[in-house]
Amino acid sequence: MSLGRYIGWSILAFTYLVLAILLRLIFLQPSKTSRASYRPKDAKCSLGVFLGSGGHTSEMKALLSTLDYERYQPRTYIYCHGDDLSLRAVSDIESSKGGLISSKMYYLLSLPRARRVGQPLLSTMVSVLKTLYIAALRLFLIPLLKNPRRPFVDLLIVNGPGTCVVLVLVSYIRRVRLEYTRIIYVESFARVKSLSLSGKMIRPLADRFLVQWPDASDSDNVIHKGLLV
């Protein structure tokens, strides 16, 4: 990929972000719950799931094992380019429901990875902006043009790593007098006494922030639910 295209992506991503922040400041709501709409318990709910590869994908697979597929449809599985493990996990998750018609109600969405292990800081900034641009296009702009009243998904579940921070930021843009995506973050089983960096960044934005160990729940808006995986 040429440097010119990287710069172009960076400029577009930065423009999206600045515009979103300005809109958010102009139309800031008194509280997040003021836009919450009533949803009957048996109503259909579109679901977005981020599969972060490796252990994150394995934990998410366990979290979804008891999912009510009749209610949560359609489902969109978001994964990073080249993550074959997560693609196999999607196949396993969906096939576990056997012959249910609803188990076919799912889609796949591939995004560039925001950061790779050991990646230098400068190139990380470029890759994050690239991911932000693609995510803003696919999760915010295109759905907004298709149907301004409906978000990309009704509910987004994430558990790390870094790319999920970009997804949450983009999903949060709609909280400007629009129906928005509810966000649930589940901290990794491995985080026993403290939150991950992704968790610390997402905590102020999540509607529900769940941890699996009591020592990791260090504030009022963190919910300890015990072991979930």
UniProtKB/Swiss-Prot annotation:
Gene3D superfamilies: Glycogen Phosphorylase B. Residues 1-6 are lumenal. Residues 28-229 are cytoplasmic. It is a single-pass membrane protein. GO terms for cellular component: nuclear membrane; UDP-N-acetylglucosamine transferase complex. Pfam families: Alg14. The chain crosses the membrane at residues 7-27. GO terms for biological process: dolichol-linked oligosaccharide biosynthetic process. Keywords: Endoplasmic reticulum, Membrane, Nucleus, Transmembrane, Transmembrane helix. GO terms for molecular function: N-acetylglucosaminyldiphosphodolichol N-acetylglucosaminyltransferase activity. It is found in: Endoplasmic reticulum membrane; Nucleus membrane. Its main location: endoplasmic reticulum. Heterodimer with ALG13 to form a functional enzyme. Belongs to the ALG14 family. Involved in protein N-glycosylation. Essential for the second step of the dolichol-linked oligosaccharide pathway. Anchors the catalytic subunit ALG13 to the ER. This is UDP-N-acetylglucosamine transferase subunit ALG14. It comes from Cryptococcus neoformans var. neoformans serotype D (strain B-3501A) (Filobasidiella neoformans).
